[in-house]
């Protein structure tokens, strides 16, 4: 367990004595017994989108372990990126009588009726990583600052090309994420806004003319779709040897497809700057090999710790608020203004992501979720051997 998680779980042990986060009354029952009784009789339902993307496997299994280590029972379901299946999976957990639902939605707009059923049975709902839309059943949202994810990518490109001092022009193409994923727009907007000044000045040029999210979106974040789209872009705008300086991809699965297209179809002699997000193992290998330049990493330890803290407070009858951040030990903010899901503004705990390049891979090892291979060249997932 990393330092962040240890701090959180230590703080949470004391919270089990509290009726809320704001006030604690006297309790003669020993803390350990109280915590075991409170959590041991309660079940958390975790709904993840799919096993086909590495990050959801990592998040799901890690969350399950952290909740179980804290004494909760857990139902964990993956829904194969099918909205109907996710609705059925959640309905099944409601029928099983779970005490709390923690949901990473496939499509945040498709769960309204199902979550109305959860609300009718007084089952609280926490949206994990992706905001769930158009329902008042969602109590809290735990994620990273998704606009900052894109902003970090854009600022990385700015610094790599020295756009504040170099005249350019440099050519850039964007690959965005799934239109059904509420986060995808934040990622794209953060990156585009960070670079808009240089696009307006003509230092950055987009030969394809694809400047809108809808033009560069990748349904289901599929690698094959990203490959096809970039292959078409290269054939249409770069086949004459026009130089591609930057391929800005919102995440690692799309970056994989774009990297494949560049390797097979790009006629230029340079290796374009290629961005990503998530810290997937194959992409980290590509970073070492110079195929991908960076990835934005969202530490699942921190996200799980924040989710556990919010969940525990809710399950114990408390009201999570800004004060909860003091126990996290991770850089985070409490946002009550930004995330309006169509019914209300959802109180949100937003953690801070960071940039990973070939020069700071050890930072991932320090999370405990990665390790160096036998040759100390590439990273492997510790989850593969646990």
Segments the model singles out, each with a brief description of its role:
Residues 5-16:
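Sec-dependent signal peptide hydrophobic core
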């Amino acid at each position: 367990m990393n330092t962040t998680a240890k701090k959180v779980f230590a703080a949470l042990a004391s919270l089990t004595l509290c009726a809320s986060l704001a006030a604690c009354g006297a309790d003669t029952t020993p803390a350990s017994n109280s915590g075991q009784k409170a959590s041991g009789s309660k079940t958390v339902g975790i709904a993840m989108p799919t096993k086909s993307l590495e990050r959801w496997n990592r998040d799901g299994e890690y969350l399950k372990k952290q909740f179980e280590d804290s004494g909760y029972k857990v139902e964990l379901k993956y829904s194969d990126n099918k909205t109907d299946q996710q609705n059925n999976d959640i309905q099944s957990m409601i029928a099983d009588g779970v005490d709390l639902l923690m949901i990473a939605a496939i499509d945040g707009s498709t769960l309204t009726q199902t979550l109305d059923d959860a609300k009718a049975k007084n089952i609280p709902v926490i949206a994990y990583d992706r905001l769930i839309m158009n329902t008042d059943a969602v109590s809290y949202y735990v994620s990273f600052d998704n606009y900052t994810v894109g902003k970090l990518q854009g600022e990385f490109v700015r610094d790599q090309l020295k756009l504040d001092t170099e005249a350019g022009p440099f050519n850039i193409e964007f690959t965005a994420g799934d239109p059904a994923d509420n986060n995808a727009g934040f990622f794209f907007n953060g990156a585009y806004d960070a670079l808009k000044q240089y696009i307006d000045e003509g230092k950055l040029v987009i030969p394809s003319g694809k400047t809108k999210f809808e033009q560069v979106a990748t349904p289901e974040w599929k690698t094959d779709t990203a490959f096809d789209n970039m292959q078409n872009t290269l054939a249409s705008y770069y086949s004459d040897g026009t130089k591609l300086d930057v391929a800005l991809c919102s995440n690692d699965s799309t970056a994989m497809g774009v990297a494949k297209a560049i390797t097979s179809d790009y006629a230029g002699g340079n290796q374009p700057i290629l961005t990503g997000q998530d810290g997937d193992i194959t992409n980290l290998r590509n970073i070492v090999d110079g195929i991908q330049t960076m990835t934005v990493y969202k530490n699942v330890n921190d996200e799980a710790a924040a989710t556990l803290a919010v969940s525990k407070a809710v399950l114990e009858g408390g009201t999570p608020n800004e004060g909860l951040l003091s126990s996290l030990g991770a850089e985070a903010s409490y946002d009550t203004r930004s995330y309006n899901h169509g019914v209300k503004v959802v109180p949100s705990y937003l953690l801070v992501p960071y940039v990973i390049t070939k020069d700071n891979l050890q930072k991932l090892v320090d999370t405990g979720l990665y390790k160096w291979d036998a040759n100390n060249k590439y990273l492997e997932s510790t989850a593969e051997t646990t």
